[in-house]
Amino acid sequence: VLEEKAKQNVPFSKELILEIQALVEKGASEEKIGLRGEMPPGFLFAVYDSESGEAEYIPPEYCDIPELLDELVEYVNTTDDHPLIVAAIVHYQLVTIHPFEDGNGRTARLMSGYVLTQRGYGFHGIGSLEEYFAYDADEYYQSLQMGLPALYYSGRENPPHPEIWFDYFLRM
């Protein structure tokens, strides 16, 4: 689907991100598709460690998601940055904004691959971002975290050392 859209030069947009997330979550319950919403009082939306059950990451509030996605879309569609940098930023921002209840990582990997393909840097059958990131999942997650606190509003919205993520991403 994405390769065909890249050939048609479909612009990077919030609608495209939502369409891809719906494909990623095909067969999931309706509440898992689309932007995440408000949590019930007393509940916190967070990414939890599967073993310890501790909150590893607390993304931005649901009400900030539309504006954050709009800013990302505007950046992608107006920047003169190198496509590899744009793809790295798309990946980081989608994982960090965490706009969906589920499928954020898969959607981020697909959308960063879309940016690369659309701008002439596709993999053309020699591998994929999924394979690269799965090769050493621990390093992937550590690079994304960049040693920052778990709370989005405590530095992840504007990381002081993005070169940690760029270095990892650009080694692919």
Tell me the role of every PLM-derived stretch.
Residues 1-172:
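FIC/Doc superfamily catalytic core
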